């Protein structure tokens, strides 16, 4: 029969089949051959790479540039009040280096720099960016005067494209300009006797480093280093930015390793990364850059910044965390951090953003939900035995570590399976729903989700479960047990006698079976004049200690249509401090549900 139906279906499909020609690409705007317009980036020639065999073992120095690079890229920059709130949040997260402004650009930036200087903890360094111009450098030093720790950050574009197109500057002129700026910063800071109360650090960025020939990047930084004369205790910071991401992350790692192995006095140098995300690889480039020798990472929370943004510091830090390496940053309340970033930047955090997105710890797929539910069941057992390792399918991070709860882990829509609903019921009612009942409830849920055309909320799922299975016999009460007694006839035979109330009348009942439940079901079969049979029964304890209760689940089959002997079945749930009472509640919940369905009619 099945074979013939498949054949008929195939024949029908064959008749309907029509030829669909391949789609021809029009290339309305894109080029058929992009090589006539774009050239592949030429990577540095590396005889031997060390970084591919390394792993990240410790946290880098972190610098947040949210208040400078991030803020300057906002359509509507932060207010002073928002900057202050953001500044203190960065400190509370654990950032020890914060780039707060471009103080020579405006009085507002200058004033905020003064606020940061006066309100930063002693162990937090305040950094400011400045162009390599004398009057701007002097203004920046003025803004930072009095800080416990301060870093002046100068920069100069070093790529051939920028030197030739934007600045019309030779390599020699670029080196001279960078050295001149460095000497001036030195004169006004660490060499000035009146500035000795501040620990002055210096950062130089060969801007567009990722598009700069490696040997020239080293050459200009050597000249800057010689002019600054760093120490091991206070190394010079060479920030090597992917100002525009021009190649794959492995190429950036090669560039970092080349610089790290060719710069002299490496112990007096701190190599910093500052990756933008033009190709979508900012995090990967940063991580490979650390493998290649970078000591420090600059970026923004959730990747704010010019164009496609800077590297997302949350992702880099939490990637380390989930590999067992402490990032020395505290994202325990990532939800509140996300709220502040969203509100101050006026840019929403994508719901799928790693770690911070609303949906990153949520599973809608049925197979995912089932795996997660099983993972938690095993995890709970192992934790009771002293195991601390986190090992849950599809969840590389314990949501509680970032302040999320487990309620958000499993979400139910029309695509969800039985595991998702079972998880919600376990979390809301404490019930470990038996697998056959999960399948039954899943069908009910999917129909509801399809009808609504949206995700079902946890409270909606719980309400639907209670209504569907007459939870604890609290709905649709047609038959009520008044009293009963079970007598032992022989080792395998029991008799139940009792009274029920039905249609406002007290009726005697009597039934037989191998135990109390089967005897009660037999008695109700006689009462309703329909054959009821126990198809599935399970129970488990609920809670612990003096508050322990019992939960019982029962599935009863019955003849739905006496003419063709069609059968159906229904589930019910009962909860009570007494196991026997829970079982009885489950039976009556099921029977009353059957009556409510209209499949079985009460006698007048």
Curated annotation (Swiss-Prot):
Q: Does the keyword Chaperone apply?
A: no
Q: Look up the record and name the cofactor or cofactors this protein needs.
A: a divalent metal cation
Q: Tell me the SUPFAM superfamilies matching this sequence.
A: 2-isopropylmalate synthase LeuA, allosteric (dimerisation) domain, Aldolase, post-HMGL domain-like
State if Iron is listed as a keyword: no
Q: Which GO terms describe its cellular component?
A: mitochondrion
Record text on subunit structure and interactions: Homodimer.
Give a short account of what the protein does: Catalyzes the condensation of the acetyl group of acetyl-CoA with 3-methyl-2-oxobutanoate (2-oxoisovalerate) to form 3-carboxy-3-hydroxy-4-methylpentanoate (2-isopropylmalate). Redundant to LEU4, responsible for about 20% of alpha-IPMS activity. Involved in leucine synthesis.
- The protein here is known as 2-isopropylmalate synthase 2, mitochondrial
